């Protein structure tokens, strides 16, 4: 593991396994103010860190969509982070944010014969909506069209997820040691973090931090956020970590590669922290294998696959 000599005295990597607690923002801010680091605005080489959805529902074992291995991911990420914080100029931290009625929740669909709603991890396919195995409770025309568009444009079926990262609930919070690290870095480097709230568009899925799977024409902000994409890629290096590798992290990477795939000199700026992210476990779908196959293709295109044990050059 990387050296963590910059970590404040109150940091303990075991906090990644501690479970929910109130983040010590004041204490970590004061520690950052005493760290004697230069302001990020003076960095000659600009480095961005994208933290995707390190939230309780994904990271804590009691979370409703717990990703196995995610606590270890956080521990490795934080160790790497405190070893390299003097080089990190910008932090982008996303928060998956949901409401009770959304197209990927069971409340949106039902079986017209039994009245039952689909269970979590059910896939809703084009055949399902054509044969009326599942019918939408809300927005019927859009919902059926969405399932078709998702298959045609994204080559995916609609997945029904457990209720997770509900706005205002504990599961929505970033895990405390991540919040503490961001507060420390903000004070130590005089750098305002960027929080990206995603997922409140009820008629579409929103995995990647830069835009929805299928943009909703009634919600302009669901379209690909090219302004943020371009801002991120103005950095000389971009490091990416978070949960889950198979979904929100992979889609974030996919959006970056999609935007800059014709510029290999920019793709080389992307660094995927592959031991700081894990995949959703599904009863029948090997999401990790699917993610690894696509990441291997991205690596061939120029994306750097790195480990947290490797310091920033």
Q: Where are the regions a protein language model picked out?
A:
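Glycine-rich, histidine-containing beta strand-loop boundary motifs that form or position
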Residues: 95
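Active-site-adjacent betaalpha module
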Residues: 1-50, 54-90, 98-313
